[in-house]
Amino acid sequence: RALSINQRAMQTVGHNIANQGTEGFSRQHVRSGTSAPDPTGVGGGADAQPTSRVYDKFVQRKILQETPRSGMFKSRGEFLQKIEIIFSETEGNGLHKALNEFWNSWSQLSNQPESEPARMQVKVQSDVLASRFRGMHSQLKGLRNEINGRLVATINQVNELGQKVAELNKQINSFEGGGQRIANDMRDARNQAIEDLSELVDVNSFEDPNGRTTVIIGRDWTLVEGNNRYQLEGKMKGGELGMLNIDGVSTNDNRRDLTRIFRE
């Protein structure tokens, strides 16, 4: 038995070394425990316990809490920077200058209402201002389309990761059904999928007694429950200036507007 335990420990060490660069992998550890004595009371030596993961639940929970905030600030900062560029006055031809010259042309016309050059200047500055508004509108529309495109990509990623977690729930539950084995690598893969989810949206998760993880996004919408995965759908709605709205679709096609989760 001692030889068997040592052999298993060596295999586990090799597994740890082989996966040191695997994203989400947790180091594994073989523990030995006292074997039950025989009927005469003679000790049975040692037995290997199920291989466990060296894993800190507190650290994992903090990662899930902080990751979406980091992603939100990064994304928001990126788009605010693009909006700032659209409204920029650094090149001397921004909206502020166009407005000033437009009102100045009207002021000159009010002082010389019969002047043909003054009238022409009003027309020229009106055209310049209108052109500036059209250009800004086009840029903002392009930015809106970029945001919608990213939201569509995010929806697809969330759905794929939710499906992955549900499938791993099923596999883990099947593997650990007898209570004698722990699906360490599958659990690592599931944790990594949930961590990847946290980069896209605010996530909370908890594990039930059967080893299956429930995943909640936002404050209270269930994405994964046991072996079941629900999904997100994006669609355009009127009155939203062309912005994509996101629905959570659960059992019996029950829908809930989750757009705020991705805009907060």
Describe the residue ranges of each PLM region:
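Structural signature of extracellular appendage/secretion-system components
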Residues: 1-264
